[in-house]
Structure formats: C-alpha cells, structure tokens
Amino acid sequence: MQDGPKEYLLGRYAEQEFSKRETWFANNIFYPFCKDQLKTAKVAYKEELYYFCISVLWRILLSTKDYIADPKLKAKCIIALEEWRAFLNGGDVPPLYNQIYMMPINRELYNTLLLPIPEHIYKEIYWYILRDTDNEIYCEKPNNRALFCKIPRFFFWAVIERDDTALNYGLRISPDGGKIDFKRYNIGKGGIKTFIYQRVINRMNEEEKARKKITSTQRDLIEQRTLHDEHLLNSELGLLLRQCGKL
C-alpha cells in the first residue's frame, strides 16, 4: 500500500536539501555537542549549516507571521520569508535578512553570577536549556529584534532589526562556510542570559495559572499514572522531572 502524494512546504528540491543538511547538523554538531565532545574542538562547515539554519527559521516564521501585531515588523518578516524561500530553492544569499546565528547552550555556558537565581529556578532554566523547544521574536530594544527557534541545547537566530551590534546571538554563520572554535565560544555576560531567565519565569507563572485550574481529582489521576510508569521514573527525563519537583 502506497501513501498518497506528499505535500512539501518549499517544494521537493528544498525539502530534500533540508534533509541532507539536517543530517549533517545532527552528526557533526548536535550529537557531538550533547556528548560534550566539542569543548575544545574546531568544526569546519560549508554552506550546509547556513542552509539548515535558514530552513529551520523559515518554517518558524511561516507559522508565526500571522500573530505579529506590529505592521512594520510584520512587513519586514514577510520580506524575510520571501528572501529565505528563494534562497532555499536555489537562489542567491538573502540580500537584507542574512544575519544568521547559532547558539549552542548548556549549563556551563549559561551559569552566571550576574543574577542571584534561586536553586529551584536554576533547575527550571536547565530544563528549558536542555529539553525544551521554543520560538518567538525577541525584542531587546525597539530597534533590536530577532526571530529565534530553540531546540534542546541550541538556539537559531535571524536578525530582523539591529542597532546594537554588541548583542550576542552566538556564532555568526556564514553562507560561504567557515570554522567554529568551540574553545573560544561563549554567550556573553547579560542580554540573552537575562532573556532566558525571564522567559523561564514567565513560563513558570503560566504553568502555575494552569495548575490552579486543574481539580484535585484530575491532579491525583495524573500523578498516579506518572508514578506507575517505571520507564519514565528510571530515565534521565524522570530524574530531571523529580529534581524540578514535577514528579
């Protein structure tokens, strides 16, 4: 039995190219970084990393563009979508929205003495960094905005507006390729760290609001179902959940 015709967001060519770049990213950066194999490494890359980052960000912006309230910002995002689509289908490097960044992140890279953070919030931050997915348009100041997509241990950024060139979005990825020196890499002292902290606090507040809406009977059923899942309890995820007070 054969499946019906498959729909492609960008067309068959671009989806096939994305699949190849995704495999390269997974094998050369994602898995080695998660295994702490890149702390002192230098990783050479060609155009595949730039293509992969834009492809990921294009998908995020396509799904979120209708929720952008600011008409001027939305207009810029529509242009970015068009430029990225053309590039992903074999066109030139985007002429306007071409500042693409990758930000690997883990506990060691996030740890900071700038904020007096309670231990239970640090655990939530680590959960966010190591496990969570997220996306949004980050607005540091009125004229500093960037789209981001977060997967476990990585942020991808595309600059939409930028006045402050000191903002640290991580590693600038070149469309011509280059080399990443992980030994010298850091995510700066403030800015993004403060953003992550506030993002986690906002999520905790939303979760607390949702938790209050659940009846005690519903909560008991959820807890009983979770406690009987031995596989979850004995897993790395289960350990992290217990540390966060969610099991």
Predicted regions and their residues:
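Structured loops at beta-to-helix junctions and adjacent beta-edge loops in soluble globular domains
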Residues: 8, 12-14, 52-60, 150-152, ...
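Short cysteine/histidine-rich zinc-coordinating motifs and their immediately flanking basic loops
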Residues: 21-29
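Generic alpha-helical propensity signal that fires on short helical segments
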Residues: 29, 34-36, 67, 71, ...
